[in-house]
């Protein structure tokens, strides 16, 4: 029988909840559907019906939705199963593509609109800062692909010995700092010629990207990492 996952910080979702109600409660959850390649429309189906239709684990989807809606949510290890590992890797890979192909270019496009109103020096400084920021994030994604994802997918029996889970630690804090730095630069230092409306829109995109990357980091730390440990213990 379907039941709510019992955890202190669980967002108020249940498998019987209608997809429309889920999205209405937290519209940013739409990005999860994109990353999981879930088909629209949903009609009047529930979370459990949608997961059955799309071939996703209900429990895993509930964890992802709860972590996205409530950044303090931490999945209980008793609900984690080794067979979830492959699906969470695909979700994280899709998240990397979502950032690289959608969020980062979308933010860059708004930056270019701001730069049209700036002097040459401001254009050069801000463009270089954002390019470095983007490059750092993409390099981190590529490192995770080489040292974590490809090892798990390509040679699962070697996960315990080969997977470098230390990559989940410091780089995420650095990405967060860089997100705050570029927001501060836009907020404090751009000349008045850059319209306030454009600066506000740019800041909204930067903060949305930062917050989504924080959620992404939480998924890696509190879902992927313990799943790797659980999988490793079951294959020894």
Named regions from a protein language model:
Residues 1-236:
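Small-residue-biased structural context
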